[in-house]
Amino acid sequence: MNGFFEEAKQRKVYRVAAAYLIAAAGVIQMASAAFPAWELPNWGLRLVIVLLLLGFPIALMLAWAYDITAQGLVVTPTTAVPRAHRRRNIIMLVATGVTISATAGFFLLPRVSAHKIDKSIAVLPFENLSEEKTNAFFADGMQDEILTNLSRIADLRVISRTSVMQYKSGIARNLREIGQQLGVAHVVEGSVQRSGSRVRINAQLVDVRTDRHLWGQTYDRDLADVFAIQSEIATTIADQLEAKLSPAEKDAIERAPTSDITAFDLYTLAKNLCLTAFGSSTTKANLLQAADLLNQAVARDPSFLQAYCQLAFAHDGVYFVGFDHTPARLAQAESAVQAASRLQPNAGETHLARAQNLYWGYLDYDGALAELEVATQSLPNHPRVVELKGYIKRRQGRWDESIRDLNRAIELDPHNILTLQQTAQTHQVLRRYVDEKSLLARALAFEPNDAVTKVQHAFVELDSKADTRPLHQMIESIRPAAIPSIANNWLVCALAERDGTAAENALTAFGGSQITFGSAENVLFNRLFVEGVIARITKNEDRARSAFIAARAEQEKIIQAQPNYGPALCVLGLIDAGLGRREEALREGRRAVEVLPVEKDQFGGNVMTG
């Protein structure tokens, strides 16, 4: 053993080993700093380290065999040792070099591998640079398609469009602050200019933690190439973030949604309407207008899958909310789902549309959940998939699972105020008032002027403590800016305080909006019934009875069109109760509960029995 160390010293192996290790450490340190700055991939740094580790045993062997002299590189003279000892010393040299390299690699490579790229991303609204400002919807469509393509990639975490809508282009945007608010490391921003048959699209990827532009490109092409550009942008961004792209994901990204630009324009307009339909005073009008636009889109391109799926959503929404709970409306939704199934039966959008239809159209919870499980495989970042799971499970009474799914939807869509409100209402049903207020406060943190959320937050005190004062004060503070949107809560507050004048003012504020008395469910009351309730609390019995009789006649027409719709039967029962028709009211109430028992729907059923 001593012979090995003596010979290694004589051949200056120690000196070479020390010099190599110092130089390698310097190279690794410089590469660790330079690779990110030069936007080089992480695997490149790992390759440098591996090559340096492999080179160490080779350097030792070269130092053993050669020496540098004034005459140049010469073979080191062989010492007078037995041949067997020389062989042993060479084996020990190689073993030592390999052991040191392996040990260094054990500590270095995991640390480099642990430096993974944060693959979270948000696609901000694109700026419309077209001379025709009406083309703004086209810029929306560009952003939405790029976002949709990225959301197909399971290796990315993509924030939903609803949460980025507030960061409109054309105003100063602090990208670092936006990244912190959305919980992402990267954002995509860009602009679109459409002129005749040409389109210019600029897109750039920014690391918001450092404000570094990782990639940028301007595309100046024919309008017919717009979908190829969208696919190219999504694929390039995935490459920049080193996202793993499966063959199925790649195929889905490269598949153009339609070949008809006009059909795409119609679809984009309709999708924008659907995106903001619920939770507003124009839900019915928006859904019906969207359905009309989508019918035009599929007439132009009968192979437009996404348009059929969105069309099914619009019809299912009109049916489920109770605007038109008729077999004819459900048949239109079913027809759109079947068209999507014929076109692409295995597409994630098809499974999502079918799940929505099974849930909203038939209350087939198990069937809908099965479809959503399949949809998850190709739509891993789609918040609607997990959001629907949450809504379905709360109707099944699987409350904790429901809240977990809804919280997951909020992670993917953190600024979706409707999802936050619905999750808060789930806590309300469970009387978890602290959690309810916390979620509503979270919504107000990014939408401090949202009247509905402000009133909902104040409503918790009425619901939990029968204290109308916070709600009353809040309503007083925001009138008349957003009267139609808060009219339901205003009406409830006025009736709770037995204030007939305030109740009449609230009723006037409804305009054409639906009256739900603040219910989270689809129990729609007609205006005449409310007039009867107000007349009763103001002791005007003649007026109350006249209003209830007229309300009953109106409600009977609804029942004739949809005889097995529980919420409509529930309202008829309440009208008969107002008329003092006790037996009829009980019969209609029982019928409503038979049609929609609590066992079938623990969320909506509780509203009707409560």
Q: Which residues does each predicted region cover?
A:
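An N-terminal, helix-rich hydrophobic module
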Residues: 1-107, 183, 212
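Acidic, proline/glycine-rich low-complexity intrinsically disordered segments
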Residues: 6, 34-38, 88-493, 497-535, ...
